[in-house]
Amino acid sequence: MASGWANDDAVNEQINSTIEDAIARARGEIPRGESLDECEECGAPIPQARREAIPGVRLCIHCQQEKDLQKPAYTGYNRRGSKDSQLR
């Protein structure tokens, strides 16, 4: 039984929407193109095993770790489920 304005499957739709957003964000972070032999940040050689494991890699392990630490944590806020986004 639906209550208010939400349909019976609104919770599942919200969960699926959140998952789809996370997948799209993760796919957007995948490197593309040809792997570099040297790190574009520090110039250190990128090991062959890393280049084979991650096609399109552009950073050495150390620089990638530093970049990952600087990345803001994902808050989990879903704008599609926000009242404000629906009122505008």
Curated annotation (Swiss-Prot):
Instruction: Tell me the GO BP annotations in alphabetical order.
Output: positive regulation of secondary metabolite biosynthetic process
Does the entry feature the keyword Zinc-finger, yes or no? yes
What Pfam families does this protein's entry cite? Answer: zf-dskA_traR
| Residues in dksA C4-type zinc fingers | 39-63
The cross-references to InterPro entries, in alphabetical order and at most eight, read: Znf_C4-type_bac (IPR020460), Znf_DskA_TraR (IPR000962), Znf_DskA_TraR_CS (IPR020458)
Specify whether Metal-binding is a keyword of the entry.
yes
Q: Which UniProt keywords apply?
A: Metal-binding, Zinc, Zinc-finger
Q: Which domain of life is it from?
A: Bacteria
Q: Which GO terms describe its molecular function?
A: zinc ion binding
Name of the molecule in the record: Uncharacterized protein YbiI
What is the taxonomic lineage of the source species? Bacteria, Pseudomonadati, Pseudomonadota, Gammaproteobacteria, Enterobacterales
